[in-house]
A protein has these predicted regions:
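Short, charged/polar connector segments at secondary-structure boundaries
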Residues: 1-86, 95-142
Length: 142
């Protein structure tokens, strides 16, 4: 695993919206983000794991730019996007996905319990407290 990130311009088609993303983005959230991007442009680093193609952070921004660009997954609508590329193994990707989600927005603990095994992830490294981890364990036991 290489530490840090490298700024790159890649094709949108290289990005997978992370299926384990524990944040829920409503249509209203995306619409608000889209309006802001149209006003001031795309600001901030979109964190992308080059190893898996998965996003770590920036799902709402990418979904908003998709709407602006009319992206539908076809080569005709593909576009260039600036990302902060990292080279993480799957475990580190998941830990950072959780860390970024927890540090920015309220997260859905049910999604965390569904998508992340207590035995698989170091929840402390992902920014979770002992109480958070106990809550996730309880949800997994249900």
């Amino acid at each position: 695993m290489k530490k840090g990130s490298e700024t790159k311009i890649i094709k949108r088609s290289q990005i997978n919206l992370n299926p384990c993303n524990p944040k829920v983005h409503t249509d209203a959230d995306i619409k608000q983000q889209k309006a802001n991007i149209k006003k001031v442009g795309l600001i901030g680093g979109i964190q992308w794991n080059e190893t898996t193609g998965n996003l770590i952070d920036g799902h709402k921004r990418v979904m908003s730019v998709d709407l602006i660009q009319g992206y539908d997954g076809t080569p005709e609508t593909d576009y260039d996007i600036k990302v902060e590329a990292v080279d993480f193994d799957e475990k580190t990707e998941k830990e950072q996905l959780l860390f970024m989600a927890k540090s920015q927005d309220p997260i859905d603990y049910n999604l965390v319990a569904k998508n992340f095994s207590i035995d698989e992830i170091d929840f402390k490294a992902a920014g979770f407290t002992k109480q958070d981890t106990e809550q996730i364990k309880l949800l997994q036991d249900d």
